[in-house]
Amino acid sequence: MTKKKAFTPLLYLVSIVFLPWWLSLSFNKSLESWVNNWWNAGQSEIFLNDIQEKSILEKFIELEELLVLDELIEEYSETHLQKFRIGIQKEAIQLINIYNEGRIHTILHFSTNIICFVILSGFSILGNEELVILNSWTQKFLYNLSDTVKAFSILLLTDLCIGFHSPHGWELMVGSVYKDLGFVHNDQIISGLVSTFPVILDTIFKYWIFRYLNRVSPSLVVIYHSMND
């Protein structure tokens, strides 16, 4: 009975870790054909935001300039003009296909993330007892660590998250999440998140040290500041 009681929270922990990945993969595979059919069968007007429109226009202008340059290099004849028009049409169709694939990717990932969020929320509510047990195990594990190990772990974590070299890591992580959610890549928004989010985390962390650690373990705070200096 005790082994079963201890095994259940571990099984729940493994499910929490691997369930999002499995759900995302499963729903992507199952919804992909349906979203493709729905998008291709739809006759709705295409809406482009400023970023998408600018990106497509830049690609098309770049393509047109390359083809014009190619025509200037070759002999000027009716055959070459015909090839030029055909090349423009083919590349225009390719750009439209790229746009359609991007929109399908956005719809697919947005729908998948909503479904996964709902399922994980229900999973967390139903597994409240297991969460309590896991929380007690975590607290017991942290309590048994020495203050030096705790201070070192806190210092390592903060340096990784809000240290001098952390912006590049944040940029990769935010960009990955941004892409996974199905949004169009935007350097300005990503740069804004990278420049503000670590600052907010740093403020919250300092407040946590001031309010919680000073009261619970003053020696840990002293060791942390000594190692940080």
Curated annotation (Swiss-Prot):
Q: Name one Pfam family in it.
A: CemA
The processes (GO biological process) annotated in the record are: potassium ion transport
For this protein, the record's InterPro entries field holds: CemA
Q: Which domain of life is it from?
A: Eukaryota
Q: Which reaction does it catalyse?
A: K(+)(in) + H(+)(out) = K(+)(out) + H(+)(in)
Annotated localization? Plastid, Chloroplast inner membrane
Q: Which family does it belong to?
A: Belongs to the CemA family.
- Under what name is this protein listed? Potassium/proton antiporter CemA
Q: Per the UniProt entry, what species is this protein from, by scientific name?
A: Coffea arabica (Arabian coffee)
Q: What is the lineage of its organism?
A: Eukaryota, Viridiplantae, Streptophyta, Embryophyta, Tracheophyta
Q: Which gene encodes it?
A: cemA
